[in-house]
Amino acid sequence: MRRAEAPSSAHPAGPIPDAGKGEGEEDEEKDGTRLGLSTTPRNCIPRRGISVLEKLVKTCPVWLQLGLGQAEAAKILQQEMAGMFLVCRDNNLKQLVLCVHFPSLKGSSAEVLEYPIKEEKAILYLEGSVLVFEDIFRLIAFYCVSRDLLPFTLRLPQAILEASSFLELETISNLGLGFWDSSLNSRGSAEPLRSPAPGTPASSSLRPTTHYANCSCEIELSVGNDRLWFVNPIFIEDCILPADPPPLPTGSYPPRPTPATPDATSPTSKGSPRRPPPPPPLPTVPPTGPARPLAPPVPPAGPLPNSPLTPTSHLAPHAPGPPGHSNQPPMTACESLPRPAVGLGPFGEEEMKPGTTPNPLHQAPPPPLPLKKALPAAPPRRRISERVSLESQNVGTSTDRDHSGISRTASLNLPPQSTVSSLGDRPPRTTEQSQDTEAKASHADSIPVPPGKAKQPPVPPPRKKRVSRQLASTLLSPLESPIQEASSEKQATGASWEGLSPVRQAGMQHLQVQSSSCPQSSPEFKGSQASLSDSLGVPASAADQDSYSTSSAEEELEFSSPNVKKKPSMILDKARHRLSFVSFASVFHAFLSSDRKLYKKVVELAQDKSSYFGSLVQDYKVYSLEMMARQTSSTEMLQEIRTMMTQLKSYLLQSTELKALVEPTLHSEEELEAIVESALYKCVLKPLKEAINSSLLEIHSRDGSLQQLKENQLVVLATTTTDLGVTTSVPEVAVMEKILQKLTSMHKAYSPGKKISILLKTCKLIYDSMALGNPGKPYGADDFLPVLMYVLARSNLTEMLLNVEYMMELMDPALQLGEGSYYLTTTYGALEHIKNYDKITVTRQLSVEVQDSIHRWERRRTLNKARASRSSVQDFICVSYLKPEQQSRTLASRADTAAQALCAQCAEKFEVSQPQDYRLFVLVDGRCFQLADEALPHRIKGYLLRSEPKRDFHFVYRPQDSGKDASSQPCIVVREPNFL
């Protein structure tokens, strides 16, 4: 599963996460003069308000009803608008359920869909989804802006959406479940859940300032009553239909598609230049189908022009169709839109009339389709055109709105995509974005510019063809030249046409012609590809950087040819590559080195209790905890832990479990040992680290060494540097802080190798400080030891004592430490000097006692390395006393230990008074078996662990006369491992 982030609460608009914004751009957002809309100026710029996540937290008594049954929740939601939801608890399954109101496609009645919310440890997720969340609030907040596997996004009640203060939210929250029947809950009864007859005018149901219909090409930011749309380029090309539109009369505005009134037009907005589309595709029979209209303050009407690059950003791919088209998938509505067009120039570009203003009297009734409240907005995508610069706003280049076929002049002048941040600030551009800007670059000269504005907004890199999103054409080597990229993309284009209908092929042909007719964009296109490949180190795959939601993968399939059969594997494959940041870690897992992959496999094997090695590691940790509780010597305790780890490593290196994970040609024997050693650090030392430190602290507190160290630390702190023997500079305050920070991080690390690495960096800082007084002069060990004592006396000596012992005894004895060994022993010597500090016998060299201690340590490492052999590997077995899982003890013994010898260990461990009456039994799935004296318990344990299906077994030490199974029959005496 992949963890998904809820919408950021820091953004002023709330629901949409910020994609990276500079200070200057934020100031421009605050300036309300950028978007000059005379009709509804308050809707232009979103005020800083309350995010969706905050609203959900404050109003949870309204929508989070754990004591409410599913039937009661469905009864409440059936009276609400589409998209309304409640979270209740299924008492039978003991899990949360998300209930969502959904208008039925088969009849006039509405239905309530139920989505179980699964809970595993500290995460929540919808059943069937790969996105996980930390809590219910983040889960609901995410599905309010992105649908994932839902038919549409969730919708909050209008009162909660319009709440602009926490006081209003508190008032709503105090109502609890009674909110749904209160006067604060506006159900919007005037808005139909289903579209009326195709010929019925629906303009009367549109409220220009409050009701807006969203679609997959838009993102709506909502703060209180204010709303702001951003064009989402993700679906600009997805919503395209390769239909040949007839030319529009000159001077007309591209109207909204409506089958009932195809001749209605509306004038263009004042001084709003349009982005010219490429030539339309070949003539074909346009399909028919519904479309959901947008409802800005002044909604125009009329047919919609179409071209391969026309951003039909206001079609509703998720809106359910009328009863006549109920067999059509809900997300393919924009594939079946009629595409008659009027008012286009010779190149498919609209004629501009600066100085004209929108006239609402000329608009025709919009098509009878569901409004915004009838069906929630399509999943939000990445905000590409979020910020607006001063120049681009005055120019008024609302490029995407014109080709969508709907006027936004009374609602918002959309910023051009050229005002987005540079590639260095944002994730790489998607295929749709690059294609959109290519159209801009090719027709830049034909865009009229208002007087006094000579500066044009920068043009982003052009876009690649749609078909290049196929995996075969995107996984290019970073070393390939731009020419090779272009040729491979062209081949992918031709291959992809084979499975398309003639209508789609015509659109693809015109797309290729349009892109080839822009020679000025070619170098820029190649440069953009090269820059993306160089900056990431891998080819820039559009499929990997497209969207935050799996829904975009599903929609891409449904917008393609109807002849292509949609398979779940295809959807999952595309979704895996299009979860940009959610699956960030899994995408780069493919680029992990073979060593890293093997390391992860060994860690998983050690954590798998059902495997033999995993059970061995688990038993070892239990045994170590028991062993540490009775130890009185820190050195012996750490040596025993190190010996056990060495034996575990030796066993795994010679076991068949590791051979099943390793490719012999990729790893040498030395590399395998290092990888297994690192994996054991994580699986063994990490969970035992705190227990080891506690035991060491207790041992040193008992023997008085810790108290002696603390007392002499105060003496050293009161000693001058001259008395310490320091003849060089000492670290300054700033450097001393860095050193103390590194020592703190060293104490937090669990790997001995990581600790030694941090120690080396710390010693380098000390050496650099010593050279400040006399640069260039070399300093030896005699100069370093006094300065090291000076530094350690100002650190946490208790932690340093534990860390030095931890590193010296737990480091792999087969590892050649090099200079790490030198500085480790020097640090150990400095600690011993501080613990036994005497002003009279102060010396700048290690004492004889310390040198002898270091020599003994080096001999121990040599002996431990020689003893690490397969024959000395100890195994572990968990034995319970009298009953299964009661007074369990983990016993260490050799693999060839007989049951009689193990019974003697059990008698000593459980302090049995009459051991001759006790025997060792094994209970397998409720059946009891007695082990013969010559039986080998470890081999029986290994046989049971490897048996299929997995069996539940326990070793029990109890009196022989009680050795009967559940049927009161005497237990069978077993000698061989395969006794079942």
UniProtKB/Swiss-Prot annotation:
Ras-associating domain boundaries: 865-962
Described purpose of this protein according to its UniProt entry: Ras effector protein that functions as a guanine nucleotide exchange (GEF) for RAB5B and RAB31, by exchanging bound GDP for free GTP. Required for normal RAB31 function.
GO molecular function terms listed in the Swiss-Prot or TrEMBL record: GTPase activator activity; guanyl-nucleotide exchange factor activity; small GTPase binding
Localization, UniProt: Cytoplasm; Cytoplasmic vesicle; Early endosome
Gene Ontology biological-process annotations: negative regulation of mast cell chemotaxis; negative regulation of receptor internalization; regulation of vesicle size; signal transduction; vesicle-mediated transport
Ranges where the record places region Disordered: 1-40, 247-496, 509-560
Comp. bias regions, Polar residues: 406-422, 484-494
Transmembrane segments: none
InterPro entries documented for this protein: RA_dom, RIN3_SH2, SH2_dom_sf, VPS9, Vps9-like, VPS9_dom_sf
Top-rank taxon, per record: Eukaryota
Quaternary structure and partners: Interacts with CD2AP, RAB5B, RAB31 and BIN1.
Region (Interaction with RAB5B): 584-729
Biased composition (Low complexity): 261-271, 514-523
Domain named VPS9: residues: 700-843
Pro residues composition-biased segments: 247-260, 274-308
GO cellular component terms attached to this protein's record: axon; cytoplasmic vesicle; dendrite; early endosome; endocytic vesicle; neuronal cell body
Protein name per UniProt: Ras and Rab interactor 3
SH2 domain ranges (all copies): 63-158
